[in-house]
């Protein structure tokens, strides 16, 4: 049976983690019901992350998702095929962030010039309050073709030709990125040599092919602050950033590291609002004390956390 949908409140935001099931309309009926009960709606969804068991799951899922958003642009999205889902009977493992109705936030698409596949129907960038959500970016040109090849070249293209212009159009900047998630199906060392190192970043080594543009080897999504929030953004030990109570943490190896970061931010691990455990076959699994999921990837163990510091 699919796991029940648990929505965790963090100030003006709701987090759903590890929403699993078939790639069907029923999945979104469950999500919509949970959002309504929690004081939100599909129209307030700010971001979606989808992990699939295989590529055959993508078309039915995207069709169901498009229908669920009822003609509106789908929230910024990242889709990755992983080696194995936590629930082997499921076709998709979904993560969602939404604003509460009480926040007054109305998601607004930002005209960044970024493209996306027509079948996916998602908005490449949304502004919700003073947060900017940029969908997963590949090294594609305006025609949708891959414009760079190899991990280092793709990374540089994504940063210089996709992220920097998009953030500028959204009245943000690279140094206002709160968190980046990076999926690499090649050599992660090449990525690190081409990536701006001062940003909280989670690097996940995935199988190849892993992306809907199958020859691509790097996909990057980011959450950034609008420039009006710069004065409220706080760096935490160079490994996390804090804005208005939301704690954005870069990828970690252990929960001991996480405890130190949360303590430095003025909170503790009881305020984890999302934990993603990426692990090689036979390695770490999800921690039951957190809203979490576990996803099998190519190698290693990477812990990706989001937290809350009560104001």
Sequence positions of predicted segments:
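N-terminal presequence-like segments and the immediate start of the first folded domain
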Residues: 1-311
């Amino acid at each position: 049976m699919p796991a029940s949908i648990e929505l965790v409140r963090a100030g003006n935001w709701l987090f759903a983690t590890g929403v699993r099931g078939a790639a069907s309309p029923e999945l979104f009926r469950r999500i919509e019901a949970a959002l309504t009960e929690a004081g939100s709606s599909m129209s307030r969804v700010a971001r979606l992350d989808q992990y699939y068991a295989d590529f055959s799951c993508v078309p039915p899922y995207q069709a169901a998702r498009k229908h669920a958003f009822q003609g509106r642009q789908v929230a910024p999205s990242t889709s990755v095929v992983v080696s194995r889902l936590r629930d082997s009977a499921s076709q998709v493992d979904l993560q969602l962030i939404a604003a509460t109705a009480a926040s007054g936030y109305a998601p607004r698409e930002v005209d960044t010039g970024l493209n996306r596949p027509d079948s996916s129907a998602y908005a490449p960038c949304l502004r919700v309050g003073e947060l900017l959500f940029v969908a997963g970016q590949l090294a594609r040109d305006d025609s949708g073709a891959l414009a760079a090849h190899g991990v280092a070249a793709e990374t540089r293209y994504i940063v210089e030709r996709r992220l920097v212009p998009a953030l500028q159009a959204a009245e943000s900047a690279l140094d206002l990125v709160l968190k980046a998630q990076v999926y690499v199906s090649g050599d992660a060392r090449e990525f690190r040599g081409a990536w701006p190192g001062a940003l909280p970043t989670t690097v996940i080594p995935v199988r190849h092919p892993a992306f809907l543009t199958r020859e691509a080897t790097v996909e990057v999504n980011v959450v950034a602050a609008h420039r009006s929030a710069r004065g409220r953004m706080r760096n935490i030990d160079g490994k996390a950033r804090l804005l208005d109570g939301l704690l954005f943490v870069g990828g970690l190896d252990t929960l001991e590291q996480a405890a130190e970061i949360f303590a430095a931010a003025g909170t503790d691990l009881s305020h984890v609002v999302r934990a993603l455990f990426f692990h090689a076959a036979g390695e770490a699994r999800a921690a039951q004390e957190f809203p979490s999921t576990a996803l099998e990837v190519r190698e290693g163990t990477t812990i990706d956390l989001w937290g809350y510091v009560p104001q």
